[in-house]
Amino acid sequence: MAMTTEVKDELSRLVVKSVSARRAEVTSLLRFAGGLHIVAGRVVVEAEVDLGSIARRLRKDIFDLYGYSAVVHVLSASGIRKNTRYVLRVANDGEALARQTGLFDMRGRPVRGLPAQVVGGSIGDAEAAWRGAFLAHGSLTEPGRSSALEVSCPGPEAALALVGAARRLGVGAKAREVRGADRVVVRDGEAIGALLTRMGAQDTRLVWEERRMRREVRATANRLANFDDANLRRSARAAVAAAARVERALEILGDTVPDHLASAGKLRVEHRQVSLEELGRLADPPMTKDAVAGRIRRLLSMADRKAKVEGIPDTESAVTPDLLEDA
């Protein structure tokens, strides 16, 4: 998950001047990384993230934008927890923060998707919503056939809100349920790059694009190499088959074969792997590849006619599966 960490590290250091965008990011981050809990009759807002820089950014924005203090607890890696996690908690002013960020609606009920002010906000707010969601639960895989930018969502409503925000940014994203969990996925390489830039991870996009291009060049080279290998194998098998047929033709015709056809046939048998053009140069006197091909074709035709009349195996009988397998 190295690329994921690179994206999150860059986004956590991004300077955002728009107050509206900062609010949208905080709201989205709390929605996708956190939860609302009732502790001793009070609403507590929590968010769990995987980088200390994200927790510090969120704590600072909550204080700067809303004036509430948050406490960050560090959960060290141990047992089933592979990595250190950071839990941000707003206890004393949890309900007020939930209302102001839009996590509660006007009647005090939890909002299941994203608040209307974020969904219907500016393009900068849509970018911020994606930034917050990715900082909360996003992942980016290495470029390849299964590369994807993905966000785990707290529910289908939040997933649909994120898909809508992506659409406003000109990015095609799909909401999916995988093993009972809601996710939003972007798979197209160009779309992933565009979304990284929109969120503010331009440096990481350049690294990702470079790796993507390297992989595509390597894949193209491999395909061409495989194509060339296949062509060489086909050519080798065709040459072996032709030599075997010519050999059988000379056996069938014996002393009755015309000299000019016999010389062309013997060249093919003696030089099984060379091209018709090279066979022509080896002939005495030299001749064109079309002339060589024509003589070999007449030799095979003459032998096959004689084999048919005499009821013996023709030249094709010399081309066995074992012969081609060894070619």
Swiss-Prot record:
One annotated GO molecular function is: DNA binding
Matches recorded under InterPro entries: Homing_endonucl, Sporu_reg_WhiA_N_dom, Sporulation_regulator_WhiA, Sporulation_regulator_WhiA_C, WhiA_LAGLIDADG_dom
**Pfam families attached to this UniProt entry:** HTH_WhiA, LAGLIDADG_WhiA, WhiA_N
* Gene Ontology biological process terms, A to Z: cell division; regulation of sporulation
Question: At which residues is the DNA-binding region annotated?
Answer: 275-308
What keywords does the record list, in alphabetical order? Cell cycle, Cell division, DNA-binding
| Superkingdom of source | Bacteria
* Family per record: Belongs to the WhiA family.
State the function annotated in the UniProt record: Involved in cell division and chromosome segregation.
Q: What is this protein called?
A: Probable cell division protein WhiA
